[in-house]
Regions:
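Hydrophobic ligand-binding cavity/cleft-lining segments
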Residues: 2-93
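Short, highly charged C-terminal tails/helix-capping segments
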Residues: 196-221
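Beta-strand/loop substructures that line and gate deep hydrophobic ligand-binding cavities in soluble
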Residues: 6, 127-196, 203
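Amphipathic alpha-helical segments that line or abut small-molecule/effector binding pockets
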Residues: 66-69, 195, 199
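C-terminal and inter-domain tail/linker signature
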Residues: 67, 78, 95-97, 104, ...
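Glycine-rich portal/gate segments that line the openings of hydrophobic small-molecule binding cavities
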Residues: 79-83, 89-137, 149-151, 156, ...
């Protein structure tokens, strides 16, 4: 039995043909689709494709997903596995933390962690200099490796989106005087930098798990 897939669009366009950009077996058989797919596969990619609007890094971590989630959902874990965020202290606002990003010459960074235990998602909402608009959002999903790789552990998927504010500081009055850099200056390095940090996370979580230590250390409890 054929389902009425895309019937509403056909009615709206007044034609049974596909809309622009749609590639499905009904209208693009394999001999047509294969060259399209091959064109999408390159040994060398343009710079703006690699460092465009999205930056994603992934890795396998030999650590139970629930224990890794508990660790990542505590904002203070960033003190351990990030390259440059240090000195997390609570603010007067609930769940909002203040730290310093040493990439920006002791720049203040504000962070609120938003998480969902059922979905195993942990999102860090951050901003340099000011706490009122946390526009830098680090999206992390933990996947049970038993489901996707058929082995114990976790798969971590981490994505950042290129918010327009990376290109210019929307709140220049809150910046420290004479600061030579803006966080967006590092966008082209996000992929490598975040992979470095993900390797840090992997090393820390696996060491604790392999050696019988709590993945979330006692100082965070």
């Amino acid at each position: 039995m054929s389902l009425p897939a895309l019937a509403d669009i056909s009615v709206h366009t007044g034609t049974p043909g596909p809309i622009d950009g749609l590639v499905r077996v009904e209208t693009s058989p394999r001999e047509v689709a294969t060259p399209i797919i091959m064109e999408m596969m390159h040994s060398v990619y343009p710079h703006d494709v690699v460092f465009g609007d999205y930056c994603t890094v992934n890795d396998y971590i030999d650590c139970p997903p629930d224990e890794l989630f508990d660790y990542l959902s505590d904002t203070r874990c960033l003190e351990e596995w990030t390259y440059s965020l240090r000195g997390f202290t609570p603010t007067d606002e609930a769940d909002l933390w203040l730290a310093y990003d040493r990439l920006g010459s002791e720049t203040k960074i504000y962070t609120r962690t938003v998480f969902n235990r059922e979905a195993l998602t942990v999102d860090y909402h951050c901003a340099w200099d000011q706490p009122d608009h946390l526009w830098m959002i680090y999206l992390i999903r933990i996947v049970d490796a038993q489901v996707v790789l058929n082995k114990p552990g976790s798969v971590v998927l981490w994505t950042n989106c290129h918010h327009p504010f990376y290109d210019h500081n929307p709140y220049p009055d809150t910046a420290p005087p004479q600061r030579p850099v803006w966080v967006g200056d590092f966008w082209d390095m996000f992929s490598a930098g975040h992979l470095l940090e993900l390797k840090n996370l992997k090393a820390i979580a696996e060491y604790r798990h392999h050696n019988g230590l709590p993945v979330t250390p006692f100082w965070m409890r």
